[in-house]
Amino acid sequence: GHGVRWVFAPSVEAVYPQAHATRIVVAGPALGFEGDLRPGHFTGVATVVCWLFQAVPAHAAYFGAKDWQQTRVVSRMVADLGLPVEVIVCPTEREPDGLALSSRNTYLSPADRQRAVALSQALAEAAGLWLTGAEITPIESAMRATMESAGIGVDYAAVVDSESLGPVTTGAAVALVAGRLGTTRLIDNRLLPPRGAISR
C-alpha cells in the first residue's frame, strides 16, 4: 500500500563476510558530536552504506534529516569516492508538539515524553535568535539552558556550518542538539539560513 515493490534484506553474513577486513573511514563531518560520543559509529555507517550502494545500484538514496551529521557523512563519502548516487535528505517528521519522530520515543516515560519537547523548543529559540543577528555562543547557551531547565542531560547544543559541521563562516548553519532523558538519548537539529559574516 506504500508503493514498495521490492525489499532488499540480506543476511548478516552477506553484508559482513568472515575475514571482513575493509572499513570506510570518513573524517571531516564525522568528527565531533556523534562521532565523539559514539566512537566508530560513522565508520560502520559509511562501510555498510558503501556496500549497499555497490550491492544495489540506485540513482538516489533517501536519508532522514533528523540525523543531520549522518547525512553529511554519507554525502561526503559519495562525493569523495565518486559514487553514482544522489543523496536526498528527507524532512524530519514531527509530533504535533514538535518532538521529532523516533523509535526511541517509545522508551520515554510519560513525564520524560513531556520534557522531551524541550529539544525542539531549544531549536526554535536558536532559530529566532539567529534571525535577530545574535552571536553563536549566546545561541548555544540559550539552547543548553532550555534543555537543562526541562531536566534534559545535555550532550551538546551547537551551531555549526551545515555542510562541514565546522565553525560557521558565511554559509548556512545548523543547530544541533542531543540529550538524555533517563536511559533514552535523543537528537534533533534545525537548519539556519545564511546571514553574512558570523562571530561567536
Task: Place the predicted regions along the sequence by residue.
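Nucleotidyltransferase catalytic core that binds NTPs
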Residues: 1-152, 160, 164, 183, ...
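Short, basic/aromatic-enriched C-terminal tail that caps enzymatic domains
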Residues: 166-168, 174-200
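Short glycine/proline-enriched coil/turn segments at helix->beta-strand junctions
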Residues: 3-4, 170-172
